[in-house]
Amino acid sequence: MRVGIPTETKNNEFRVAITPAGVAELTRRGHEVLIQAGAGEGSAITDADFKAAGAQLVGTADQVWADADLLLKVKEPIAAEYGRLRHGQILFTFLHLAASRACTDALLDSGTTSIAYETVQTADGALPLLAPMSEVAGRLAAQVGAYHLMRTQGGRGVLMGGVPGVEPADVVVIGAGTAGYNAARIANGMGATVTVLDINIDKLRQLDAEFCGRIHTRYSSAYELEGAVKRADLVIGAVLVPGAKAPKLVSNSLVAHMKPGAVLVDIAIDQGGCFEGSRPTTYDHPTFAVHDTLFYCVANMPASVPKTSTYALTNATMPYVLELADHGWRAACRSNPALAKGLSTHEGALLSERVATDLGVPFTEPASVLA
């Protein structure tokens, strides 16, 4: 099979969908690997590195898209790439379709077979391809939140850990999943007072046990959420419903009652965001004001640390890439139910029930295309 990797096109997206180790394994198995020249530069992987591993360097993205049977990306296609989507090609990448009707329509119109990293799900409910980027985004959320709390950045002028005799920042994390856990862990390590809210008592119990009560936990009722947000210097939204739009848990009217200069970091922005006022931003212009607070809603946070993120992501994706390349998408999905959970579109059919519900598009059972 011909496996293609173009350069990422999203704003300040420095990750790449494969490493030289992945290239070497694919070519060892007899597959061709086509990589757009310069695709790895943002992750400090040179063309020479890829070529030495067995890749063929291609001059343009158009050629990669046109020649590849299996196309690997990190982020969803942007509008400039919609014309490259085509029938008969497998696209394996993050998609986040519930938050993008335009991308969904482009995939359906093209007939592309697409598989979303973020909805590949094992029998125990784990999301093995989303997890490493959630770890990175959660850890970054505490860092960027601390940075934007500085008065010079428009924040309250609060130091996360305080100093002797002066109280630390009050950090609230909404969601105790992978991203929320990692955000809370870093914020706690920085010395902040951290409260995590979730509706999953087992996750709260795990946090309480691991951190011996140093991280406060609350069941996420409307009452507890409102009180915590009003007290917070920094709120980190880390809510996830796999494949679906994130619920809007923090209203603009609640934001209006927050402390002036408080910062809100929305990790859930890829899925539409969990704050009412959220809208996607970029690293060029990462923040905007809502009432007297500062919103940070960069949709590709892990892109800022590509030397970490590229390797963390590809460590997780490569076993699935090898299955797709070795057996084709249909056989791979038949033999691996976790991969089948990631099926999103095929020949104009939408195969994700949650995306179909959120966007009001007819749903097709994946089993019907796997038969």
UniProtKB/Swiss-Prot annotation:
GO biological process: alanine catabolic process; L-alanine catabolic process; response to hypoxia
One Pfam family named in its UniProt record: AlaDh_PNT_N
Residues involved in substrate binding: R15, K75
Family: Belongs to the AlaDH/PNT family.
Thermal behavior of activity: Relatively stable, it loses only 25% of its total activity after 4 hours at 60 degrees Celsius. The enzyme is much more active at temperatures above 37 degrees Celsius, particularly in the reductive amination. The velocity almost doubles at temperatures between 60-65 degrees Celsius compared with 37 degrees Celsius. Above 65 degrees Celsius there is a sharp decrease in activity, due to thermal inactivation of the enzyme.
Pathway linked to the protein: Amino-acid degradation; L-alanine degradation via dehydrogenase pathway; NH(3) and pyruvate from L-alanine: step 1/1
Details of cofactor binding: Binds 1 Mg(2+) ion per subunit.
Protein purpose: Catalyzes the reversible reductive amination of pyruvate to L-alanine. However, since the physiological environment of M.tuberculosis has a neutral pH, it can be assumed that the enzyme catalyzes exclusively the formation of L-alanine. May play a role in cell wall synthesis as L-alanine is an important constituent of the peptidoglycan layer.
InterPro entries, sorted: Ala_DH, Ala_DH/PNT_CS2, AlaDH/PNT_CS1, AlaDH/PNT_N, AlaDH/PNT_NAD(H)-bd, NAD(P)-bd_dom_sf
Subcellular location: Secreted
UniProt: NAD(+) binding residues: 134, 178-179, 198, 203, 220, 239-240, 267-270, 279, 298-301
Protein name per the record: Alanine dehydrogenase
Species name: Mycobacterium tuberculosis (strain ATCC 25618 / H37Rv)
Biophysicochemical property: pH dependence: Optimum pH is between 10 and 11 for the oxidative deamination and between 7 and 7.5 for the reductive amination.
GO molecular function, one term: metal ion binding
